[in-house]
């Protein structure tokens, strides 16, 4: 093909990564971002790759599949992971970032590339020519209508909920202790211990609190990885005690005693003045949020700088619509990337943008497109979302279960995952030399 310009719609994690991968390969990019001309219900700035949920990109170790995915992306010169490494804040074995510095870094990196032209306007029709659609879970109504017409499929709806962010200075540090679970990495989390009585009182308040009403035509489907805390609470006390409030590995550093339940807070900014409440994504009404959070030991006088909010997430039925190259099956010059493909998570979204960007570049250069092998975390995600059961398709995080099985079965989980990680990184390093 002679066309040397690619349209990228959306400058979130996936779109920014796709634009970067295209630009560094000499391709001219028209990057469309409707913010700040038109905002979404969850975004607050005009920056690229704004994080609207947690500030954590999850595990940074090779013992976890998402850690392997990050390492693969580093080998492929990911703009998102480079910015995250640059803007990291203490988070034990995880990679968490100062969300404002991170978004600014990605914006500067992508916007200042000579091959990238940024156009701040809403795209209401899918353009002709090579295009990557990375408009995310909050795709505008106009473009959603176009996509529905294009795909011939009904959208699937579910909700992501963002956790509240609080001021550290408002916490009672006499009741809170610093520790990471099982003492992994540096002590990076503030822990609020609860007795059984305190937990029961908190659980009762949480289950009786009022939530923001949903529109009648919207169907509630919660993805397990970002379930609102009040929905979790209604499933039963044990759901919380085995979930975000589990006390295992968080024994008090002075007494050595294990609390009945623990609420963890994670640093949210580089200065260490703001903390988010881990796993407490919510769509409670704001007044109720504050009253419920005040029942957590140490948060009696909490100052909330950003209340938890809930927003719709939208994703397409990728198994019926996409190839492992992230190409649309019925139009070879159209690609999709990000959460709307059914990959779930910041890193997974960026990784899909990386693959779509590389393959869109290959397409316009007349080269063979890349299908990353299932031995890699990147390839296993692409394989999963394009080959799994169409009827029950749900979003998926990176995990070792998606990777191609090892030639020899290893019973020990730690050793098995180590083998998965080593094989994935060796494979991606070989591939990186050819693309």
UniProtKB/Swiss-Prot annotation:
Report the EC number(s), separated by commas if there are several: 2.1.1.74
Q: Which reaction does it catalyse?
A: uridine(54) in tRNA + (6R)-5,10-methylene-5,6,7,8-tetrahydrofolate + NADH + H(+) = 5-methyluridine(54) in tRNA + (6S)-5,6,7,8-tetrahydrofolate + NAD(+); uridine(54) in tRNA + (6R)-5,10-methylene-5,6,7,8-tetrahydrofolate + NADPH + H(+) = 5-methyluridine(54) in tRNA + (6S)-5,6,7,8-tetrahydrofolate + NADP(+)
Q: Record's Gene Ontology CC terms?
A: cytosol
Biological process terms in GO annotation = tRNA methylation; tRNA wobble uridine modification
* Cofactor(s) needed: FAD
Q: Which SUPFAM superfamilies match?
A: FAD/NAD(P)-binding domain
A family per Pfam: GIDA
Give its localization.
Answer: Cytoplasm
EC class name: transferase
Please give one Gene Ontology molecular function term for this protein: tRNA (uracil(54)-C5)-methyltransferase activity, 5,10-methylenetetrahydrofolate-dependent
| Origin: domain of life | Bacteria
Alphabetically list the UniProt keywords.
Cytoplasm, FAD, Flavoprotein, Methyltransferase, NAD, NADP, Transferase, tRNA processing
Main subcellular location: cytoplasm
- Coiled-coil positions: none
Entry binding sites for FAD:
10-15
Assembly mode? Homodimer.
Q: What does the similarity note say?
A: Belongs to the MnmG family. TrmFO subfamily.
The function of this protein is: Catalyzes the folate-dependent formation of 5-methyl-uridine at position 54 (M-5-U54) in all tRNAs.
Please give the NCBIfam families that the UniProt record associates with this protein. Answer: gid_trmFO, PRK05335.1
Q: What is this protein called?
A: Methylenetetrahydrofolate--tRNA-(uracil-5-)-methyltransferase TrmFO
Source organism per UniProt: Bacillus subtilis (strain 168)
Encoded by which gene?
Answer: trmFO
């Amino acid at each position: 093909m002679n066309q040397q310009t690619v349209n990228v719609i959306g400058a979130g994690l996936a779109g920014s990564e796709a634009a970067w991968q295209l630009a560094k390969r000499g391709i001219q990019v028209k990057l469309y971002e409707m913010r700040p001309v038109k905002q979404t219900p969850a975004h607050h700035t005009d920056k690229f790759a704004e994080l609207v949920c947690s500030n954590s990109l999850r595990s940074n170790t090779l013992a976890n599949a998402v850690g392997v995915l990050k390492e693969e992306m580093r080998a492929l010169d990911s703009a998102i992971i480079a910015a995250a490494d640059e803007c990291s804040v203490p988070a034990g074995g995880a990679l968490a970032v100062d969300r404002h510095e991170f978004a600014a870094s990605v914006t500067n990196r992508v916007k200042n590339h000579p091959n990238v032209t940024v156009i701040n306007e809403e795209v209401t029709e899918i353009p002709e020519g090579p295009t990557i659609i990375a408009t995310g879970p909050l795709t505008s109504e106009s473009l959603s209508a176009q996509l529905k017409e294009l795909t011939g499929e009904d959208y699937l709806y579910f909700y992501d909920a963002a956790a509240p962010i609080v001021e550290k200075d408002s916490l009672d540090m006499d009741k809170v202790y610093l520790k990471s679970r099982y003492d992994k990495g540096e002590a990076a989390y503030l822990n609020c211990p609860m007795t059984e009585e305190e937990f029961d009182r908190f659980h009762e308040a949480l289950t009786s609190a009022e939530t923001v009403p949903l529109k009648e035509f919207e169907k509630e489907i919660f993805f397990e990885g970002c379930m609102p805390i009040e929905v979790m609470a209604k499933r039963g006390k044990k759901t919380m005690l085995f979930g975000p409030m589990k006390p295992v590995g968080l024994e008090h550093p002075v007494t050595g005693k294990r609390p009945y339940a623990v609420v963890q807070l994670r640093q949210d900014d580089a200065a260490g003045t703001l903390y988010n409440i881990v796993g407490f994504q919510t769509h409670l009404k704001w007044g109720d949020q504050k009253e419920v959070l005040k029942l957590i030991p140490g948060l009696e006088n909490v100052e909330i700088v950003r209340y938890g909010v809930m927003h719709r997430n939208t994703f397409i039925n990728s198994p019926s619509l996409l190839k492992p190259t992230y190409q649309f099956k019925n139009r070879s010059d159209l690609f999709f990337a990000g959460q709307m493909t059914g990959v779930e998570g910041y890193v997974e979204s960026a990784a899909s943008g990386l693959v779509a960007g590389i393959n869109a570049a290959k397409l316009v250069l007349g080269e063979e497109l890349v299908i990353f092998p299932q031995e890699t975390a990147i390839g296993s995600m692409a394989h999963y979302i394009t080959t799994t059961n169409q009827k029950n398709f749900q979003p998926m995080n990176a995990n070792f279960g998606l990777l191609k099985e090892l030639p020899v079965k290893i019973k020990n989980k730690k050793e098995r995952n180590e083998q998965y990680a080593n094989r994935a990184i060796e494979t991606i390093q070989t591939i990186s030399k050819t693309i």
